[in-house]
Regions:
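TPR/TPR-like (Sel1-like) alpha-helical repeat modules
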Residues: 45-47, 59-80
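Repeat-mediated protein-protein interaction surfaces in helical alpha-solenoids
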Residues: 1-13, 26-39, 91-92
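Generic helix N-cap/helix-start motif at coil->alpha-helix transitions
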Residues: 15-21, 45-50
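Structural register within alpha-helical repeat arrays
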Residues: 24, 51-54
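TPR/TPR-like alpha-solenoid helical repeat scaffolds
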Residues: 12, 54-63, 79-96
Length: 96
């Protein structure tokens, strides 16, 4: 799946079945369901899930928790605008 198809899929009621849990987290975030997004990020394992988890906590304003998850993901704390970070993470996860 490419980024354009991912964005188009957000119009559906449920995420495409082939998406990883980390991508499902970002899909639910785009739908405005932070709680469901967080559930997916918590269930995801590895750096991809940690990266989605970091973004979600940064978005909710919990900078200390976000910093913890950025560290687990091996990433610096993002200072990008949230929409730009969301897109960058989605694009990175789609090619990984």
């Amino acid at each position: 799946m490419n980024f354009t198809a991912f964005k188009a899929s957000i119009a559906r009621e449920a995420p495409p079945s082939e998406l990883s849990l980390a991508l499902q987290a970002l899909w639910w975030d785009a739908k405005g369901d932070w709680d469901k997004a967080h559930e997916c990020a918590q269930a995801a394992e590895g750096a991809a899930g940690d990266r989605a988890h970091a973004y979600l906590h940064r978005k909710e304003g919990d900078q200390a928790n976000a910093a913890y998850w950025y560290g687990r993901a091996g990433q610096p704390v993002s200072t990008s605008p949230l929409p730009a970070e969301w897109e960058a993470v989605v694009r990175a996860l789609l090619i990984s």
